[in-house]
């Protein structure tokens, strides 16, 4: 199997020219310029009227003569944009009936996005709730990704953009509590699923094992549960969207059966 780093490197090469936004809103994503704010930087930003107490050395004499009023120069501080990546690492992410687990696909997705941003040079990246920092090595990024803890233990650090990767198989009240801990406006919720979790292709007697340690469940006729199961799963997906969409977040769904290049479409 190709390593997740190799897959992420290949995918990140596609993300940059694709200019893919993290939100459905028309905000810059790949290659976005740093924000500007008034500061003590060396780059000229704008003129403004001179006021008492301003440094006389900053008076723009030529501009003041042209506009016939005293003007002073303002400079800018470049403020790097920040991206927080969170990948769920619960046991349910390891379930698979395909060549790739939800965990593997989520890791590749996060690494690709993070590395694409890190290569732009003006993005600070936070992995798994850690501090925002500059990354110069995707292997270091991968190591920090593996340190994941549930962000229910505390809010994620404030960020301009947030990418959440999970199967989101939580009770609705748990999802609501988790989402309340996110301090960002531009958020993408990436819901990964195994095709069997949607189609429920089982029939006859089946013993289901709870990957989270809740014990086994023996079902005598799995096929008889298919319709009710599919309805419950669809209801859960709608509940997730009902929590995310009113916040202005984007919800996308990816099957482990398909390539992650689907995110480019």
Give, region by region, the residue ranges found by the protein language model:
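Short, surface-exposed charged micro-motifs
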Residues: 60
């Amino acid at each position: 199997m190709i390593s997740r780093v190799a897959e992420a490197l290949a995918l990140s090469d596609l993300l940059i020219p694709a200019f893919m936004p993290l939100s459905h809103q028309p905000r810059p994503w790949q290659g976005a310029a740093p924000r500007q704010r008034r500061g003590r930087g060396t780059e000229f930003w704008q003129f403004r009227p001179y006021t008492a107490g301003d440094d006389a050395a900053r008076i723009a004499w030529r501009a003041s003569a042209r506009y016939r009023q005293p003007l002073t120069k303002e400079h800018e501080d470049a403020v790097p944009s920040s991206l927080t990546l969170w990948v769920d690492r619960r046991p349910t992410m390891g379930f698979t009936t395909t060549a790739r687990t939800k965990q593997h696909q989520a890791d590749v997705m996060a690494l690709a996005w993070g590395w694409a941003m890190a290569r732009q040079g003006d993005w600070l990246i936070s992995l798994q709730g850690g501090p925002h920092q500059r990354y110069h090595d995707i292997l270091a990024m991968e190591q920090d990704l593996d340190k994941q803890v549930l962000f229910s233990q505390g809010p994620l650090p404030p960020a301009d953009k947030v990418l959440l990767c999970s199967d989101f198989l939580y009770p609705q009240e748990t999802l609501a509590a988790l989402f309340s801990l996110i301090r960002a406006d531009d958020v993408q919720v990436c819901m990964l699923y195994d095709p069997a979790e949607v189609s429920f292709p089982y029939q006859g007697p089946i013993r289901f094992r709870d990957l989270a340690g809740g014990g086994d469940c023996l079902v005598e006729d799995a096929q008889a549960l298919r319709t009710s199961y599919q309805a419950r799963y669809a209801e859960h997906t709608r509940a997730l969207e009902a929590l995310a969409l009113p916040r202005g977040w984007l919800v996308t769904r990816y099957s482990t059966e398909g390539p992650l290049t689907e995110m480019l479409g």
